[in-house]
A protein has these predicted regions:
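Acidic, Mg2+-coordinating catalytic modules of nucleic-acid enzymes
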Residues: 1-195
């Protein structure tokens, strides 16, 4: 369920969280996709990306969207430099300050909306997913002194070790998050683990 209404006169999108409608739609989809041993796990809100923007990963996702925009707009160099990362982080921080008075849901909508073009489509989804994965890996790795964040896409190449305490903390946050729980449960179910 899209968290907005469209003004019939101006065609402008007006935020409307629609919690009840989202909950009902999720329940219907889960029933629809559950059959025998196959079980449906669908997002509790509009899309996967919107749920991530609502979740404990919101700040990381917001930055990843800006990293993705920098990569998409870099015609010649499809990588992030420290300067571009700094600009993207600053852009995300500026927006976060501007959006402080908004509800979490409206902030998430604004973050997700950054990914969309005028037609409501996005060519950023795959890029943002890679950026988010790299940012989370960076966040949970033991980074040697002098290594800058532009290396976040090459952590395996450099053989950086994982900081197990940071990884465990992030795992706990993700597993407890109400907007990510459906993904965690789907993975556990597919792996034969108890959910």
């Amino acid at each position: 369920v899209k968290p907005y209404d469209t003004d019939s006169t101006t065609k402008e999108k007006v935020f409307n969280e629609k919690v009840t409608e989202s909950t009902e739609a999720e329940e219907k989809k889960n029933i629809k996709y559950t059959n025998g041993a196959v079980r449906g796990f669908t997002s509790p809100r509009w899309t996967l990306e919107y749920c991530i923007a609502l979740s404990c990963l919101s700040k990381d996702f917001h930055k990843a969207v800006h990293y993705g925009m920098k990569i998409l707009n870099a015609r010649e160099y499809i990588s992030l430099t420290d300067a571009k990362i700094g600009e993207a982080n600053k852009d995300a921080e500026t927006e976060a300050q501007l959006w402080e008075s908004l509800s979490d849901a409206e902030r998430a909508y604004r973050i997700y909306d950054l990914m969309l073009n005028g037609d409501g489509k996005s060519s950023l989804k795959a890029i943002v997913a890679q950026c988010l994965a790299s940012a989370l890996r960076w966040r949970t790795s033991k980074i040697p002194e002098g290594v800058t964040q532009e290396k976040m896409f090459d952590l395996d190449l450099y053989g950086f070790k994982t900081d197990e305490a940071k990884k465990a903390e992030l795992n706990t946050q993700i597993e407890k998050d109400q907007y990510l729980r459906y993904i965690v449960n789907a993975i556990k179910y597919a792996a034969g683990e108890e959910i």
